[in-house]
Amino acid sequence: MGAASGCRWPWPPLLPLLLMLLLPPPPLPVALALDSALQPGNFTADEAGAEDFAQSFNSSSEQVLFQSTAASWAHDTNITEENARRQEEAALISQEFSEVWGQKAKALYDPIWQNFTSRTLRRIIGVVRTLGSANLSPAKRQQYNSLLSNMTRIYSTAKVCFPNKTATCWSLDPELTNILATSRSYTLLLYAWEGWHNAAGIPLKPLYQDFTALSNEAYKQDGFSDTGAYWRSLYDSPTFTEDLERLYHQLEPLYLNLHAYVRRALHRQYGDRFINLRGPIPAHLLGNMWAQSWNNIYDMVVPFPGKPSLDVTSAMVQKGWNVTHMFRVAEEFFTSLGLLPMPPEFWAESMLEKPSDGREVVCHASAWDFYNRKDFRIKQCTQVTMDQLSTVHHEMGHVQYYLQYKDQHVSLRRGANPGFHEAIGDVLALSVSTPAHLHKIGLLDHVTSDWESDINYLLKMALEKIAFLPFGYLVDQWRWGVFSGRTPPLYNYDWWYLRTKYQGVCPPVVRNETHFDAGAKYHVPNVTPYIRYFVSFILQFQFHQALCKEAGHQGPLHQCDIYQSTRAGAKLRAVLQAGSSRPWQEVLKDMVGSGALDAQPLLDYFQPVTQWLEEQNQRSGDILGWPEYQWRPPMPDNYPEGIDLVSDEAEASKFVEEYDRRSQVVLNEYAEANWDYNTNITAEGSKRVLEKSTQMANHTVKYGIWARKFDVANIQNFTLKRMIKKIQDLERAALPFKELEEYNQILLDMETAYSVASVCHANSTCLQLEPDLTNLMATSRSYEELLWAWKGWRDKVGRAILPYFPKYVELTNKAARLNGYEDGGDAWRAAYEMPFLEQELEQLFQELQPLYLNLHAYVRRALHHHYGPEHINLEGPIPAHLLGNMWAQTWSNIYDLVVPFPSASKMDASEAMINQGWTPQRMFKEADNFFTSLGLLPVPPEFWNKSMLEKPTDGREVVCHASAWDFFNGKDFRIKQCTTVNMEDLVVAHHEMGHIQYFMQYKDLPVTFREGANPGFHEAIGDVLALSVSTPKHLRSINLLKSEDDGYEEDINFLMKMALDKVAFVPFSYLVDQWRWRVFDRSITKENYNQEWWSLRLKYQGLCPPVARSQGDFDPGAKFHIPSSVPYIRYFVSFIIQFQFHEALCQAAGHKGPLHKCDIYQSKEAGRRLADAMKLGLSKPWPEAMQLITGQPNVSASAMMTYFKPLLDWLVTENGRHGEKLGWPQYNWTPNSARLEGSFAGTGRVNFLGLNLEEQQARVGQWVLLFLGVTLLVATMGLTQRLFSIRHQILRRTHRGPQFGSEVELRHS
């Protein structure tokens, strides 16, 4: 609200309001004598003498007012001590002038002036005789002036500084104003609001109390009960306060509906925590420091966002509008009505922009009358915005008023009442803001005239006009209470009582009587009456309606534009030229036909949006008002440190769009470099990988740091919040550059050591892991040959990786801590978004343990039968090299040794595949066919052209570990696999194709969401299909199994084969990250890496090393995922949920019968469920994806137990028949190959459980194992009882399993 000079009255009592000293006042000047020429002469004490008195006063007053105004202008446009001193000198002269002329008027005319026949003369004498502060003694007058100066200085120089910093401080204009207008960060808005109210308000309170006492003392001498009574007298109505209350209540329903609608929109933005739909709105969220107008949050509340924007700020900037042009456009509007142009002095002397020469100025927009009938100016720190364009018209309205009444007596050069002066410019702004007018002046390309556009426009106007009404009403309600003595000493309590009562807003932080929040509003310390604005907001719509009628407008009032109507201009001119020479009621009646303030034109103007708001609020079930009026919002987290965080969702959307666009390029280049290296291991390829890793890290850091500028806690859009939280995690890129380079090099060196390693015979024949050692471990039944391969691989790979691993752990932990996690394990577990992940996983493991222990006991007996008692102890752990796999993670390769019914039909399709000439490509074509049979997507041409489906024969070194690749361009997806034509690799092919299908289903999501719902989901999809592929029914359908036998023995054989793959894997997949998590949290140190590894393998798998291992060995490093830093618990999760998926999809496919016989091939309904879940990617929490597939959101082992129920029953019977002991009570047994007699000569070391340890380590180990043994014995006894009852239990039961988050590596293993 422009409230400065344009709203100052020229009569003496308010001349002190011109004192705006922004610097500490200089020493009080010596008393200045008023020039004798300005002293009143001798006049007769009658009406004729009074006429002469008024004429003489007019000429003298113009001189004094010009000098005083010029001094104030000089100070406000260049705040210096010298200008402050000159301003105060001029103010003192003005007060002395007021005193001598006022006292003269009282002495001569007090008995008779109210009986003068001239109404105009009565009005002039009435003004002159009211002295105001000039009634005070000279000492109190100086005290009064000093209080005004200091209050103005405190307000004008107050600043809010950034927390813990002094360099970054914000002034109200433009910094804090812009923050309140544009920020959507709850915490930043709070800091700006609280900072300003503290900085400006608190120091003012004692000064305002003293000012109030002096002001009341002065006006009581003029016959008023207090200052408020004088202010109200300017409206010359005995029922003024009652009229105002009537008007307010007439408008209140419209405000309440607007309030409820806006509150609902703010609730969408800030959520339940900060917005109570039954309470007041926190006062800092409405786009304005005082919540007096809400148009700055229009973007948050716009009814129909698809309609063209009505904020033409961007058009003004694009068209090159500057500040001068804005004022020329406003001037042209006035002249188009036949009103006066601005005089040359206006353009020569006004300050229309904030000076760039370093001067301190008072930026508050104001219009100035220099009382010489030619010099009129505006002071405004204008910015090129639509909002400021309205302010320009408002201020120029004041100047037009000055121009029109400049020939009136100086005492009558004011508005008909104070509200008139504020209304004139705003009347024109009502026309200027219409889409039709904006089109006329080239700021809107098209005028969209439809109902939705009208509602948008009217709501935008309501945010400015209706939202202001209660604030415009309450400010002086509070001050009148202060002046009357009703409010003190509870200034702040009453201020917030009124603001809650009328506005429905509340303070966002605790406020008390040490605060003085009313003082944070310009008009309070600058002693500018405020009820004028409430009056003006009523009047301007009365004026607008009358002028539109005069202009011949037809149609809704809100569409009227009086531009170029000279008839409207003539009517307006009559009001302006009258000044205050006539009662305002007469002037108003001449203008609108009625002499009373009337809210009906305002209600008519907003009628369409009023009805729309009522309907919206009823539809939303919103409560009008704030019944929970005592509610206050909580303090935000991380306040005030997090104030610079951004919660503006529009800005956040732009950020994630840019991140997504750039990420696709960077990730594609990173994937290509890694692919080239993995399919051709060379030094040049290694160098390129490191370059792209650095590029990727830089990208991650750049956007991660940018993402950390967003306040995700206060972003309400779920998708935005989820994306930004993920981008904020810099992962390894959080490391300093040198350490990041070192980290990347360590990973590359470890992975290279793993990938190129080979084990050589004495004759120099060397075997690589793929396919040589893998085939040997799968097919050999020679104890010694298996031992050679097992030991050779670990000696070659593990020992090579060990030197790198401690540093890798250190850097992984450092990166995790830099990302806000406790250690690397904590960071990995965070992907599952579960506070009790470890406990939930343990529960799942315990549910599956009976199945594993029975399988372990059965397989151990079979191995005992094959290898004999010297190699197998029926009550001890199994040597780890005998289970058909380098890591004993799956045992399906020893199926021939453990087959329950050897005479039953064989189900291994490997031989048929070879005999039928299957190739690796044929295997993947078959997998692709399975997916398409479900109605899922076929792989694109790029897949067949670019994948590496076989180990190259050209001598290239490659990483053979099977993996699926997403190149992040929406069309390039590949698999890298050294495929062997056998049944096992056919299953692997389906597993990897499951990853590819997942990639294709979520390819249109933002990059951030192109991951599985949780890491286990991505691993499970292909395996779900493999459960069908493995069934005899499906193998027959693809001609890989000819036998039609499908009896009990075949069922048990099939389930045994599946259990060797699925059940045997459960403890290994569980323990790998149990070990790593403990390494990361330092409960396992580098001195006992290997010892703890084998402790866990013994505890969970019941395995022991076949040869003595020492701490110089590093057997975990012999598993791909350890040197490659790939989290492993995902596989444990995937092996459980794949059975849940299988069970649900089988139901969808209409399968009847045992779960293990289900084949979902060609079921479109099963495919639809899978596709719906995969399309979500990571965009929703994983329970939602689980719900789409299974109909419930939890992870449970029950489906897996159901699947293997027939086998478990058979195993329990078979183990019981042989008297097998479940578990490994002789846990300290080691095979002959691992035994060495006594101590290691000359070393002081001993052999313990196959480990080469210090004697003290061995002693500790013995005690630990004794404790484990007792525990295991108790557990075994309990387990035996449980197993006898388990056959009679219904395994289908609801289980509230863990709820996982997700994160996918670039390569899926």
From Swiss-Prot:
Glycans are attached at residues 42, 58, 78, 115, 135, 150, 164, 322, 512, 526, 680, 698, 717, 763, 945, 1194, 1228. The record marks 1236-1237 as: Cleavage. Its main location: membrane. Binds 2 Zn(2+) ions per subunit. It is found in: Cell membrane; Cytoplasm. Zn(2+) 2 binds at residues 991, 995, 1019. Its EC number is 3.4.15.1. This is Angiotensin-converting enzyme. The lineage of its organism: Eukaryota, Metazoa, Chordata, Craniata, Vertebrata.
